[in-house]
Amino acid sequence: MDDCSKDIINCLPDNLLCQILSNLSTKEAALTSLLSKRWRYLFALVPNLDFDVLPSLHPEVAMQDQDQTSFIDFVDRVLKLRGKDHINKFSLKCGDGIEDEDVFPWILNTLRHGVSDLSLHVSPSLVYWLPSKVFASKTLVRLKIGPKDGPRVKLRNVCLPKLKTLNLDSVVFEEGKIGFAKLLSGCPVLEELSLLNLAWDRWDSCSVSSKILKRLTLYCAHSSRNPKSVSFDTPNVVYFEYSDNIANKYPKVNFDSLVEASIGIRMTKVQKANARYVSDVDEETEMVGNATDLLMGICNVKTLYLSYDTLETLNLCCQVIPVFNNLTHLTIESHPELGWESLPNLLKSCPNLGTLVFQGLLHKATDRCGDVCMCQGLENSHSCLSSSPVKCLKILKFGETNDDDDMEIEMEQIKNFLEKMPNLEQLIIYYESSIDNDLVRVSSQLQEVPTVASLKCKIQVISDNLSLSSTLPISLSMENGFHL
């Protein structure tokens, strides 16, 4: 038997070993330098460098001076050992104690080495200016900058001709909307944009305009103000995730290619207080804002997720809910302190809805809660559910509170669905319980519910430990929509 048969790893070429080491953090890869002389500097030649010194286990413990010096020396040494070798990916995560005078040379070094994937997660305690050369790289394909309380950027000339993915967390644009517009115009092939904790509520107007963009994620920082004007001119975006205070107006909302969207628009505390006052004084609730134009711009979406804040906003800040002709999959998030007032009109506006998902069923009972639930006990009243095209109904977080009264409310709501949704073919309940008998009991109770649902309606009750499936008995199926 030759030596290579005995030691397969050591017989591999250096470039292949470097690829293997790239799957480890640089700190872990450095441990292989103890194996032999051949391995001594091999870890520094890997194309992907990952430096992580964040105190993830005990974030309250500050980095000691000795550790800081050791980390800085380690990064300096690795970059020096690489010489002029190309860097494919550079990821840096460091907390308090690592100053910008240490970080900036590392960033500039990687840019000189043609880095294509740059990820920076630096100290949240420092308010620092990011080197302008980061936004003038001809090699960057992916750029990620964070975390919360991230850097300030003053953009003069943006030139990122190859950048396809951009993720910014808490980055402050010194020139506001002008700087943001410069950034977008300097990324001619950008396909994916993610902006987290963006504070744009002080801008005169907020606009995202790109003909190339395909995925857009926008989470705006919580604020006591409403954006004055928000526009989206993104005709090729297929995925849109948006969380923000409702804007005063939406002059342009262009999502011609939209397939999937997640919307989390909310009112400010002042708007909520005004809405409660109007509700107490008048029988009819007056609008305190208007989200109609935003909804009109996304009404061709196929898959939609609405947060509980959005449900409240649609009730108080939307004059008309447009028709969602293409919508086939809708997810609704519920909150025990917020009602379902906007839900009936929303469901009536989804003529081709096939799958309806409730992320929790507990909600606030009000005298305008609508005809979707049983809050007012109107058992014989006409319900929008009676004309629902939904074939698949999913209930998430069932039994989450582990409270008997809440469980009874949830069960009554599910029974209401079965009794009124004529096209239902599948009911799936995700039960938050580790006790198998709980699932058996719920499944048995649902088998006794008179229903207008399809004769072949299948009921599934699922937990982490067990999955029960059954079909409604023919004797309990209501003919011609007659309610027992």
Swiss-Prot record:
Protein name: F-box/LRR-repeat protein At3g59210
Any Pfam family the entry gives: F-box
Lineage summary: Eukaryota, Viridiplantae, Streptophyta, Embryophyta, Tracheophyta
Keywords, comma-separated and alphabetical: Leucine-rich repeat, Repeat
Presence of keyword Repeat: yes
Entry annotated with the keyword Manganese: no
LRR repeats: 144-170, 172-197, 205-234, 303-334, 335-360
Residue span(s) of domain F-box: 6-54
